[in-house]
Amino acid sequence: MKAIKIAIDGPASSGKSTVAKIIAKNLGYTYLDTGAMYRSATYIALTHGYTGKEVALILEELEKNPIFFKKAKDGSQLVFLGDEDVTLAIRQNDVTNNVSWISALPEIREELVHQQRRIAQAGGIIMDGRDIGTVVLPDAELKIFLVASVEERAERRYKENLEKGIESDFETLKEEIAARDYKDSHRKVSPLKAAEDALIFDTTGVSIDGVVQFIQEKAEKIVDMS
């Protein structure tokens, strides 16, 4: 049976990662959290006080402490920068609020996209992000673009933060998500947009199981036809 490449794109908190992880597990595919990679680069910049003018220093740190993933005992994914477990650190609000400008740096995107493509070569992979279907994996057999209302996405992020013990304010989250949408869709390099051949799916009011079922049925149909 042919293993395909699945690209899931969409704005912040549209459910990409949650859905991608479940589908990867169901299909026995590799899940690559590209967002965690950009968050890791952001964490480096914030930790060292680097600005957008110091891209070379950020890349140097990434070379010294490469990003890699491990599985925890409970099956969840851990993110490392060299020897440092940054799984929780990269989900903090300061990282969330700064990841857009890091993602917009051409040199950072070029390096991380190179890494992502290398990992995806063999197929049997599912990636989620902002530009997977348009830039990273334009040859992906299945491209999905998830959308949802700002209100619903803020509610999801609020619940996630509570579960992780991160203090949050719902109204502030709404403002931050709307601001990030604007930044992501208006940046010069790899702006957030659906690929021309992507299936656009509005997840507002749809359960996680419902979204998983929709994508998985499409994937299985493509595999059966190939």
From Swiss-Prot:
One of its GO terms (biological process) is pyrimidine nucleotide metabolic process. ATP binds at residues 10-18. It is found in: Cytoplasm. InterPro entries: Cytidylate_kin (IPR003136), Cytidylate_kinase_dom (IPR011994), P-loop_NTPase (IPR027417). It comes from the Bacteria. It holds the Pfam family Cytidylate_kin. Signal peptide: none annotated. It catalyses: CMP + ATP = CDP + ADP; dCMP + ATP = dCDP + ADP. Gene3D superfamilies: P-loop containing nucleotide triphosphate hydrolases. GO terms for molecular function: ATP binding; CMP kinase activity; dCMP kinase activity. Keywords: ATP-binding, Cytoplasm, Kinase, Nucleotide-binding, Transferase. One of its GO terms (cellular component) is cytosol. It is an enzyme of class 2 (transferase). Its EC number is 2.7.4.25. Belongs to the cytidylate kinase family. Type 1 subfamily. This is Cytidylate kinase. It comes from Streptococcus pyogenes serotype M1.
